[in-house]
């Protein structure tokens, strides 16, 4: 992603119902990189032999790896650069596996003009199935 890919929406430009998305296919490298950065080396993510003994029968991606794509949408698409996270709730509904394409979507559900806060419904899906759902509140830059 380059600076040319960034989209900035000022608070005054945002409307209820507005949405934005991005998608990423999860690779084995993504899981190992996230494990290293987050220090979450749970064998359910990084050890296939162990993962085969779990309910999932194979390694799964870290839930927060997929949830991070919500942050990417908020920081680069809607509202975009300058957006500051205030709150995020998440419910993890299904696992994400290597090779799955995760689509993160944010949809504006409310505006608080006096604080320049925007609330969003947040979801991550794989093949149309919701794997993460939640709500975010973001402080958004205003014009001038």
Swiss-Prot record:
UniProt enzyme class: lyase
EC number: 4.2.1.119
GO BP terms, alphabetized: fatty acid biosynthetic process; poly(3-hydroxyalkanoate) biosynthetic process; protein homotetramerization
Gene, per the UniProt record: phaJ
Protein name: (R)-specific enoyl-CoA hydratase
Function comment: Catalyzes the hydration of trans-2-enoyl-CoAs with a chain-length of 4-6 carbon atoms, forming the corresponding (3R)-3-hydroxyacyl-CoAs, which can then be utilized for the production of polyhydroxyalkanoates (PHA) polymers. Cannot use trans-2,3-octenoyl-CoA as substrate.
GO molecular function: (3R)-hydroxyacyl-[acyl-carrier-protein] dehydratase activity; hydro-lyase activity
InterPro entries referenced in this protein's UniProt entry, alphabetically: HotDog_dom_sf, MaoC-like_dom, UPF0336/Enoyl-CoA_hydratase
Catalytic activity: a (3R)-3-hydroxyacyl-CoA = a (2E)-enoyl-CoA + H2O
Quaternary structure and partners: Homotetramer.
MaoC-like domain segment(s): 13-128
Keywords for this protein: Fatty acid metabolism, Lipid metabolism, Lyase
């Amino acid at each position: 992603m380059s600076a040319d890919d960034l989209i900035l929406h000022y608070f005054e430009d945002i409307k209820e119902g507005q949405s934005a998305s991005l998608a990423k296919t999860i690779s084995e490298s993504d899981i190992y990189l996230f494990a290293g950065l987050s220090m979450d080396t749970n064998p359910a993510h990084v050890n296939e032999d162990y993962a085969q003994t779990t309910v999932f029968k194979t390694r799964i991606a870290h839930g927060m790896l997929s949830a991070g794509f919500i942050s990417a949408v908020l920081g680069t698409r809607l509202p975009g650069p300058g957006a500051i996270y205030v709150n995020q709730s998440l419910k993890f509904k299904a696992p994400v596996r290597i090779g799955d394409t995760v689509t993160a979507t944010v949809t504006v559900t409310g505006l608080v003009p006096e604080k320049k806060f925007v609330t969003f419904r947040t979801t991550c899906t794989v093949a149309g199935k919701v794997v993460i759902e939640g709500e975010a509140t973001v402080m958004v830059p205003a014009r001038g």
